[in-house]
Amino acid sequence: MAPTLYDFHHLPHVKTQNESKKALWVTLLLTMFFTAVEIIGGLISNSLALLSDSAHM
């Protein structure tokens, strides 16, 4: 019998999914942090540019 060219592995994707969820949460928390910083900075400095930029995040 001839050897096959493809070797299929059906491994569970739990580790990959957990890593992806962790990366998603870190990204979400960083975005929320910078949004809050821009809102506070915009209110303190009366900067409409910072406030509008924070609203677009």
UniProtKB/Swiss-Prot annotation:
Compartments in which it is found: Cell membrane
Gene Ontology cellular component terms for the protein in this record: plasma membrane
Main localization of the protein described in the UniProt heading: membrane
Keywords: Cell membrane, Membrane, Transmembrane, Transmembrane helix
Membrane-topology annotation of the record: Multi-pass membrane protein
InterPro entries: Cation_efflux_TMD_sf (IPR027469)
Chain ranges passing through the membrane: 24-44
Signal peptide extent: none
Family: To cation A.eutrophus efflux system protein CzcD.
This protein's name: Uncharacterized protein in glgB 5'region
Protein source organism: Bacillus caldolyticus
